[in-house]
UniProtKB/Swiss-Prot annotation:
Its main location: other. The keyword Lyase applies. This is Ethanolamine ammonia-lyase small subunit. Belongs to the EutC family. Binds between the large and small subunits. It comes from Ralstonia nicotianae (strain ATCC BAA-1114 / GMI1000) (Ralstonia solanacearum). It is found in: Bacterial microcompartment. Its cofactor is adenosylcob(III)alamin. The gene is eutC. InterPro entries: EutC, EutC_C, EutC_N. It catalyses: ethanolamine = acetaldehyde + NH4(+). The basic unit is a heterodimer which dimerizes to form tetramers. The heterotetramers trimerize; 6 large subunits form a core ring with 6 small subunits projecting outwards. Pathway: Amine and polyamine degradation; ethanolamine degradation.
Amino acid sequence: MTDERDDTPATVTQNPWQALRRLTPARIALGRAGVSLPTRPQLAFQAAHAQARDAVHLPFDPAALQAQLHAQGHATLLLHSAARDRDQYLQRPDLGRQLDAPSAQLLGDHAAAHPGGVDIALVVADGLSALAVHRHAAPLIAGVAEGVRAQGWSMAPIALVEQGRVAVADEVGERLGARMVVILIGERPGLSSPDSLGLYFTYAPRVGLTDAARNCISNVRPEGLGYAAAAHKLLYLMREAWRRQGSGVLLKEAAEVPLLEAGRRNFLLD
């Protein structure tokens, strides 16, 4: 029997940058099958898109997060925005920036029972990815709270807001009489990151502020900005805002972070 060499061209043409794929979750060097994507990356894209859609509609579980925070020794307040459900939240962004009447009353009662205000108010909202909050809020808060205690700042009970958007933190902070407010919120899911957590920090919060008054730290998750690094950056912003009495465009995030030492040469230079 004579061996015959198969000269049929490979179905998938590999990309010369394929070695770079192990360094990033980004969709690079996927190769091609003719003029189209190969089947495997096409299916992976569809799966990632489905994960992103699921993250947007995943119901927030404030009771589970509340239990985690209670285990850390934190008091909590369960609140709700003026958006009655997920559909209205997505269609009416303005309602996600406001508290409903019972939540506003609850904060008013708490503030009346604790006159004088507080230094820090922490707010957690589901945003566009409850998955991010479920996975990352509690471990991040543990690091932030430790830094807040080290500064000697007072902290209000952590407010858990269902169907909340970023600006709802301004109302929470104002009603609690907080000098500074931080909201941890699920970011809009991406095709490689359905669980990214965002932090928004504001000094002297009040209803009606714009994004110019806020500082943002984004993509908080183990595959992005780790918990320790995010807490470090946030505490830097808090200290500087306290000193300068301002945030947003008045405050530049310039926290020093430790540099990683390379364990080997950059393969691009070899």
